[in-house]
C-alpha cells in the first residue's frame, strides 16, 4: 500500500501547488487597460442610506433584555471541586521484560531434482511485505472482476 499512497499523495501535492499559469501561458499586457472603478455600493451618496424613520403607527424596537433597568443574568453554577491527581512514586520499578519464547531453526525443504544431488533450501517463515501487498492486490482484482 505504501507505493500507492505515495503516488496518490504526489498527485494531490502537484494538483494543489501547480499554478494555472502554465496552462494559460505566460501573462501578457492587457491592451484594454485597467478596469474602471466599481460603482458606489449604495447609490450616489456617501455611506449607507439612512434607516426609515419611525412613523406614528410604528414604535421603537424593544430594548435589549439586559438594559439599564433590568438586572444582570445570573452567574453560572459553580463547578464541583476536582480531586487532585495521584502523584506517581518517586522511584518507579522498571517494567517487566516480556519473555520471548525460543524460536526454532528455519524450516528446511528437501529438493529432489537429481538423485545424486541432495540440495537443502532454507526459507524464512516470516512473510514479506511485498507478498502481503501482492495477495491484497489479487483480492481487490478478483472482487472487481466479480462485479
Swiss-Prot record:
| Main localisation | secreted
Name the job this protein performs. Answer: May play a role in protection or detoxification.
Q: Where is the signal peptide?
A: 1-22
Q: What's an example GO cellular component term for this entry?
A: extracellular region
- UniProt-annotated location(s): Secreted
The identity of this protein, by name, is Submaxillary gland androgen-regulated protein 3A
User: Which tissues and organs express this gene's product?
Assistant: Secreted into saliva by submaxillary gland.
Pro residues biased stretches: 33-105
Q: Where is the composition biased (Polar residues)?
A: 108-127
| sequence repeats mapped onto the chain | 43-54, 55-66, 67-78
PANTHER family for the chain: SMR1-RELATED, SUBMAXILLARY GLAND ANDROGEN-REGULATED PROTEIN 3B
Write down the InterPro entries for this protein, in alphabetical order.
SMR-like (IPR026288)
Ranges where the record places region 3 X 12 AA tandem repeats of G-P-G-I-G-R-P-[HP]-P-P-P-[PF]: 43-78
Amino acid at each position: 500500500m505504501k507505493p500507492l499512497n505515495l503516488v496518490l499523495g504526489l498527485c494531490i501535492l502537484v494538483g494543489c501547488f501547480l499554478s494555472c499559469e502554465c496552462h494559460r501561458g505566460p501573462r501578457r499586457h492587457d491592451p484594454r487597460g485597467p478596469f474602471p472603478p466599481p460603482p458606489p455600493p449604495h447609490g450616489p451618496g456617501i455611506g449607507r442610506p439612512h434607516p426609515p424613520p419611525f412613523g406614528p403607527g410604528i414604535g421603537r424596537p424593544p430594548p435589549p433584555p439586559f438594559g439599564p433597568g433590568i438586572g444582570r443574568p445570573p452567574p453560572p453554577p459553580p463547578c464541583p471541586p476536582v480531586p487532585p491527581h495521584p502523584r506517581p512514586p518517586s522511584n518507579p520499578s522498571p517494567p517487566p521484560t516480556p519473555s520471548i519464547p525460543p524460536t526454532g531453526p528455519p524450516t528446511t525443504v528437501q529438493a529432489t531434482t537429481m538423485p545424486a544431488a541432495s540440495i537443502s533450501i532454507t526459507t524464512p517463515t516470516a512473510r514479506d511485505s511485498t507478498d502481503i501487498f501482492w495477495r491484497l492486490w489479487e483480492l481487490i482484482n478478483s472482487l472487481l472482476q466479480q462485479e
